[in-house]
Amino acid sequence: MCNNEAKMSELLSVQSDAPAKKINLMDLTRQQMREFFKELGEKPFRADQLVKWIYHFGEDNFDNMTNINKKLREKLKAVAEIKAPEVAVEQRSADGTIKWAMQVGEQQVETVYIPEADRATLCVSSQVGCALACTFCSTAQQGFNRNLTVSEIIGQVWRASKIIGNFGVTGVRPITNVVMMGMGEPLLNVANVVPAMEIMLDDFAYGLSKRRVTLSTSGVVPALDNLSKMIDVALAISLHAPNDELRDEIVPINKKYNIKTLIDSVNRYLTVSNANHGKVTIEYVMLDHVNDGVEHAHQLADVLKNTPCKINLIPWNPFPEAPYAKSSNTRIDRFQKTLMEYDFTVIIRKTRGDDIDAACGQLAGDVIDRTKRTAMKRQFGQNIGVTEVN
């Protein structure tokens, strides 16, 4: 909140004849927007109206906000804007999954919409690239560029909802669940991820249940310990290995926060969270003859024996030059059955969107190349093969 307050103070103190950068209202939670309106000399309830217009109705044009008087609309146009990422590329899978490359400044991030019979999940990115260098993940090959802002995170939800066509029909939600499982490590961008999730939960905005907003982390333990003090959402842990020796190799952050340290933190979170039904989701990617043996299943059962959890087994999704192979169905089934002998709930995740590189672990794909080509196109003004959506 401090950053946004500083931003507002700077904006409102600028002399009238000097150019001022407009504040993006999507960077503000409703409470922060109420402070913004107080700074403008307006009633704080105006923030409630604006939030409804932006997120319930998908409106980004002040002139269309009919219950706000013209004088205030003109004042807002002078100092503020409503700006979400634009879609640079859209791909649709045969199974109904949609992947968008969203333009964020000079870079792109990927957002995935996964419709099912009883729900529709949006997978949202939190960073441009990722610094954690997990060896089985395509995003890791991009490296880390920067954190996304609040507006770039919540703007993915806004843009997807706009495309899917929810706006104007409140109460009917084509997006029922949001998972922070896209590009990046959310707990390395807490300052922007938490406010974005607050907007997702806000009844004046998207009004999602805290059980339908999931944060996935590879295990940034200090941030996880602080998370429950800031917000309560569903938690998923990208574990992927049952022992420190193997996890050090494939999830390098384990060298800093080992499995015991991580699981202890998870258990602390579960004691105060109401969003998890008392259970955490454990994500485990299946790598052929790397982490998918029966002995690994027994080790995993031992690691999780005191942690209420649901285990998702994720068939690995290949990407170019990766040093792994996908586990066979036989090995995955055997792994599942071994864990179920310990009375764990174990689900084999159905692969969605793999024909458009939208499946788990595939995000980034050719987004690196597209980002470079987009920058070159802007620099040289030439058509160099970037497919854009207008």
Curated annotation (Swiss-Prot):
One of its GO terms (molecular function) is 4 iron, 4 sulfur cluster binding. It is found in: Cytoplasm. S-adenosyl-L-methionine binds at G184, E185, S216, S238, L239, H240, N317. CDD domains: Radical_SAM. GO terms for biological process: rRNA base methylation; tRNA methylation. Residues 116-355 form the Radical SAM core domain. The keyword Iron applies. Binds 1 [4Fe-4S] cluster. The cluster is coordinated with 3 cysteines and an exchangeable S-adenosyl-L-methionine. Its cofactor is [4Fe-4S] cluster. It catalyses: adenosine(2503) in 23S rRNA + 2 reduced [2Fe-2S]-[ferredoxin] + 2 S-adenosyl-L-methionine = 2-methyladenosine(2503) in 23S rRNA + 5'-deoxyadenosine + L-methionine + 2 oxidized [2Fe-2S]-[ferredoxin] + S-adenosyl-L-homocysteine; adenosine(37) in tRNA + 2 reduced [2Fe-2S]-[ferredoxin] + 2 S-adenosyl-L-methionine = 2-methyladenosine(37) in tRNA + 5'-deoxyadenosine + L-methionine + 2 oxidized [2Fe-2S]-[ferredoxin] + S-adenosyl-L-homocysteine. Disulfide bonds join C123-C360. This is Dual-specificity RNA methyltransferase RlmN. PROSITE patterns: RADICAL_SAM (PS51918). Belongs to the radical SAM superfamily. RlmN family. Reaction proceeds by a ping-pong mechanism involving intermediate methylation of a conserved cysteine residue. [4Fe-4S] cluster binds at C130, C134, C137. One of its GO terms (cellular component) is cytoplasm. HAMAP family: RNA_methyltr_RlmN (MF_01849). Specifically methylates position 2 of adenine 2503 in 23S rRNA and position 2 of adenine 37 in tRNAs. m2A2503 modification seems to play a crucial role in the proofreading step occurring at the peptidyl transferase center and thus would serve to optimize ribosomal fidelity. Its EC number is 2.1.1.192. Keywords: 4Fe-4S, Cytoplasm, Disulfide bond, Iron, Iron-sulfur, Metal-binding, Methyltransferase, rRNA processing, S-adenosyl-L-methionine, Transferase, tRNA processing. The active site is at E110 (proton acceptor), C360 (s-methylcysteine intermediate). It comes from Haemophilus influenzae (strain PittEE).
